[in-house]
């Protein structure tokens, strides 16, 4: 049984929605156990409430040490100036002990993201995230062009060969589109299929 973790940070629910669909895609693969978790919020509760952070998310909070228990991890993050969110960075900066033990070497790592605007740094967020995963010796997996949603030219949409993405809009009012959610499910399924092969 291959074990897959979908681990995310979401400020306003967009990445949470994407993470749920990534998990659904992974669950569609036989022989896979899927866990959905989030990283801790680092903004003080009163400040988070004041700026509308979505704190009522059902996914439990992950611990750093449990990352070693999985065969594949799909990481989800909003972008912050072309990089991962600080909450995800803070979590990953605590993985030095895992790095020392080589605990993540050979495991699959994959990334999906959200930006406020069409050109808001989706691809750089994902590719800069890959640097951390490569330092851990993880095997990077994206979304191949076998996923038809990547070539959808009929609408403004997220989705890259580096990973699924969504556009939240500058005010956060835009929700993930059907095409973006399809790509998210594809990514989860694709990673899970590869995890089964590696685990066997």
Swiss-Prot record:
GO cellular component, one term: membrane
PROSITE patterns named among the record's database cross-references: FLAVODOXIN_LIKE
Flavoprotein as UniProt keyword: yes
InterPro entries: Flavodoxin/NO_synth, Flavoprotein-like_sf, Flavoprotein_WrbA-like, FMN_Rdtase-like_dom, NQO
Database matches in SUPFAM superfamilies: Flavoproteins
Keyword Oxidoreductase: yes
Cofactor note: Binds 1 FMN per monomer.
Domain spans labelled Flavodoxin-like: 4-191
Reactions the enzyme catalyzes: a quinone + NADH + H(+) = a quinol + NAD(+); a quinone + NADPH + H(+) = a quinol + NADP(+)
Molecular function GO terms recorded: flavin adenine dinucleotide binding; FMN binding; NAD binding; NADH:ubiquinone reductase (non-electrogenic) activity; NADP binding; NADPH dehydrogenase (quinone) activity
Pfam families for the chain: FMN_red
Sites where the protein binds substrate: 99
EC numbers on record: 1.6.5.2
Sorted UniProt keywords: Flavoprotein, FMN, NAD, NADP, Nucleotide-binding, Oxidoreductase
PANTHER family: FLAVODOXIN-RELATED PROTEIN WRBA-RELATED, FLAVOPROTEIN-LIKE PROTEIN YCP4-RELATED
NCBIfam families xref list: flav_wrbA, PRK03767.1
Family: Belongs to the WrbA family.
Protein name per Swiss-Prot or TrEMBL: NAD(P)H dehydrogenase (quinone)
Organism, as annotated: Burkholderia multivorans (strain ATCC 17616 / 249)
Lineage: Bacteria, Pseudomonadati, Pseudomonadota, Betaproteobacteria, Burkholderiales
